[in-house]
């Protein structure tokens, strides 16, 4: 009788311990950020540094973000979100030509991408191509979004692009 009890207890403990270990969400993979996620974190930090006037530190953050995004794009190509931020960081680092290329690659994947259309419109304003900026605004016209209002004000000269 005692032998059956200990055998049952041992089996119960073994089953219970396996059940808890199988359901654990404490795996390192769930805590690991992707290169894209890390890049977005750097971009947000760079934007905050710009607001504080710390432009050199912001530039360093944009450079780190850009490197991570290039790696992310190689690992998982054809992501409009990645190409949007690649265009953004490249533009922020002063390379409008390659920034535009990234934006256009992203639009080939997702022509209605809100972020790309806004940022590409801003790039067109910055490079004195207002007619192309208006085209981006027209794409955003049905979105009922902040990006539409921001780009509209930038095109009208009522607002300066903060990015």
Residue positions per predicted region:
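Terminal, low-structured helical/coil segments at or just beyond the last alpha-helical repeat
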Residues: 24-33, 48, 134-163
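Structural marker of alpha-solenoid helical repeat scaffolds
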Residues: 75, 109, 140-143
């Amino acid at each position: 009788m005692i032998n059956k009890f200990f055998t049952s207890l041992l089996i119960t403990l073994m089953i219970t311990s396996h059940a808890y270990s199988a359901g654990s969400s404490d795996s390192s993979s769930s805590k690991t950020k992707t290169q894209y996620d890390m890049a977005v974190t750097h971009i947000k930090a760079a934007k905050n540094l710009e607001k504080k006037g710390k432009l050199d530190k912001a530039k360093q953050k944009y450079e780190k973000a850009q490197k991570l995004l290039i790696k992310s794009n190689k690992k998982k190509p054809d992501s409009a979100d990645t190409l949007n931020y690649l265009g953004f960081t490249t533009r922020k680092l002063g390379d409008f030509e390659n920034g535009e290329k990234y934006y256009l690659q992203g639009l080939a994947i997702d022509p209605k991408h809100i972020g790309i259309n806004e940022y590409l419109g801003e790039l067109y304003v910055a490079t004195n191509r207002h007619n192309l900026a208006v085209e981006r605004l027209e794409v955003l016209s049905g979105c009922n979004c902040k990006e539409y209002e921001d780009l509209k004000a930038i095109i009208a000269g009522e607002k300066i692009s903060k990015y």
